[in-house]
């Protein structure tokens, strides 16, 4: 294992968003992030084996709807129901996790990957997270997106 986990996470997220949904995340300083205006989705996944940790993504529903629509091949995010969004977010974090693990640890280690979970959190909690130094901050199509890597 060499390198900064956050750098590998940013690389994995960028690659996955570009290839899966044709979106490019732009890294941003916390002070430059757009405000979270409402409820957000927090999707998390854990991995264990020789190494263990957790990855997470937090985004508002409009961005999650847009990503879900693109994953599902729909015209726009208005046609996507909550359960479809949750499933798409689980798939997104699962693919990001797989790419992250390969970048971080190589092709040899075998990991057990948890079933991703989706939680709702309010915008105020998202704003508080911006001060956490372990949070990666991105802007995707004008929307805020937070990422987190926790190595155990």
What function would you assign to each model-found segment?
Residues 1-152:
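N-terminal auxiliary interaction/assembly segments of multi-subunit proteins
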């Amino acid at each position: 294992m060499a390198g900064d986990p956050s750098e590998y996470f940013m690389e994995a997220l960028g690659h996955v968003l570009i290839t899966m949904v044709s979106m490019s995340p732009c890294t941003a300083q916390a002070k430059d992030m757009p405000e979270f205006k409402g409820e957000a989705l927090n999707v998390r996944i854990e991995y264990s084996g020789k190494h263990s940790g957790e990855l997470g993504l937090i985004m508002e529903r409009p961005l999650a709807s847009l990503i879900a629509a693109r994953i599902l091949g729909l015209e726009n995010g208005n046609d996507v129901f909550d359960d479809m969004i949750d499933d798409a977010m689980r798939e997104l974090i699962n693919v990001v996790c797989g790419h992250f693990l390969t970048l971080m640890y190589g092709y040899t280690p075998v990991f057990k990957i948890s079933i991703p979970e989706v939680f709702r959190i309010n915008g105020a909690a998202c704003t508080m997270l911006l001060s956490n130094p372990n949070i990666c901050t991105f802007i995707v199509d004008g929307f805020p997106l937070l990422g987190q890597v926790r190595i155990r």
